[in-house]
Amino acid sequence: MQVILLENVDKLGYKDDIVTVKNGYGRNFLIPKKKAIFASKTAKKVLAENLRQQVRKLEKIKKDAQTLANKLMNISLTIGAKTSSNGIIFGSITNIQIADELAKKGVQIERKLISIKEHIKEIGSYKATLRLHKDIVIDIPFEVIAE
């Protein structure tokens, strides 16, 4: 079954993408939750016309994301956490703490755009992935230190 995504769906696609999904996933989850519509011929024509009209807007959004990515390349983050005597963190470091540190540096990023591949439970250096645009993905190094 082909559907047109109405919003970004993790591990599936981005808004206005035409993707193939299993029938049950499309009918029981994506379409009822208003995350997608069935990709009929008329829906595809409407999508093509909308995309033609949005080309300039999308180029500006991509340019802004690239500018932000260039700005973020020079930023290094240090996150303080309470630790035990042998360097293990009480709790863990999540995308919320990274978004807060970026906000302190003057860069507002939604925490949904930040992903960390591993669970951070110890002091050390790590990398977080920021998905600023569907074509622009950068890694930001950060260090976890004891408070």
Swiss-Prot record:
GO cellular component: ribonucleoprotein complex; ribosome
Cysteines engaged in disulfide bonds, as pairs: none
GO BP: any one term: translation
Pfam families assigned to the protein according to its UniProt record, in alphabetical order: Ribosomal_L9_C, Ribosomal_L9_N
Family the entry assigns: Belongs to the bacterial ribosomal protein bL9 family.
Main function: Binds to the 23S rRNA.
Entries under SUPFAM superfamilies matching the protein: L9 N-domain-like, Ribosomal protein L9 C-domain
Originating species: Azobacteroides pseudotrichonymphae genomovar. CFP2
NCBIfam families: L9 (TIGR00158)
Protein name: Large ribosomal subunit protein bL9
Alphabetically ordered keywords of this record: Ribonucleoprotein, Ribosomal protein, RNA-binding, rRNA-binding
